[in-house]
UniProtKB/Swiss-Prot annotation:
Name of the protein: Large ribosomal subunit protein uL16
Subunit structure: Part of the 50S ribosomal subunit.
SUPFAM superfamilies in alphabetical order: Ribosomal protein L16p/L10e (SSF54686)
Pfam families: Ribosomal_L16 (PF00252)
Listed GO biological process terms: translation
Gene Ontology MF: a single term: structural constituent of ribosome
UniProt KW keywords: Ribonucleoprotein, Ribosomal protein, RNA-binding, rRNA-binding, tRNA-binding
A cellular component annotation (GO) from this entry: cytosolic large ribosomal subunit
Source organism per UniProt: Pseudomonas putida (strain ATCC 47054 / DSM 6125 / CFBP 8728 / NCIMB 11950 / KT2440)
Function: Binds 23S rRNA and is also seen to make contacts with the A and possibly P site tRNAs.
Residues annotated as transmembrane: none
Protein family (similarity comment): Belongs to the universal ribosomal protein uL16 family.
C-alpha cells in the first residue's frame, strides 16, 4: 500500500479540496491516460486496487505509471468512544483529486486494450473518469 515514509507532522487538518488540477493534468509519460472528471479522495487501497486491475488486464505488455500518491492522513476515533480526549489516530491515507488530474498512464499497448484496461480500473474508483490520449504538438 502507498503511504509516505515519513512526514513532518503525524496528523493534518481536514482542509478543503477546491479548484482544478493545474499540475499533473497533462499526459506526460505514457500514450494513454485515465483522467479524473470529478473531485474527491482516493484512498491508498483504491489506488492499489485499480493498479491491480490494470496490470492484470494488460498482462506482460505495456508500462504503467501511477500519477497520484496518497500523502494526506485521515484520522478516526475508535468505535464507541466518547467525544473529546484528543484527535483519533491515523486510520488511512488519501490523495486529494481535483477535476483534470491524470491518475494513471499506460504505453506499449493498443488503444483498444488501453480503453478496456482503464474501464476495469475506473470501476474500482469512486470518481468519474475519462480516457485521454497524448497530444503531440
Amino acid at each position: 500500500m502507498l503511504q509516505p515514509k515519513r512526514t513532518k507532522f503525524r496528523k493534518q487538518m481536514t482542509g478543503h479540496n477546491r479548484g482544478l488540477a493545474l499540475r499533473g493534468s497533462k499526459v506526460s509519460f505514457g500514450e494513454f491516460a485515465l483522467k479524473a472528471v470529478a473531485r474527491g479522495r482516493l484512498t491508498a487501497r483504491q489506488i492499489e486496487s485499480a493498479r491491480r486491475a490494470l496490470t492484470r488486464h494488460v498482462k506482460r505488455g505495456g508500462k504503467i505509471w501511477i500519477r497520484v500518491f496518497p500523502d494526506k492522513p485521515i484520522s478516526k476515533k475508535p468505535l464507541e468512544v466518547r467525544m473529546g480526549k484528543g484527535k483519533g489516530s491515523v486510520e488511512y491515507w488519501v490523495a486529494q483529486i481535483q477535476p483534470g488530474k491524470v491518475l494513471y498512464e499506460i504505453e506499449g499497448v493498443s488503444e483498444e486494450l488501453a480503453r478496456e484496461a482503464f474501464a476495469l480500473a475506473a470501476a474500482k474508483l469512486p470518481l468519474a473518469t475519462s480516457f485521454v490520449k497524448r497530444t503531440v504538438m
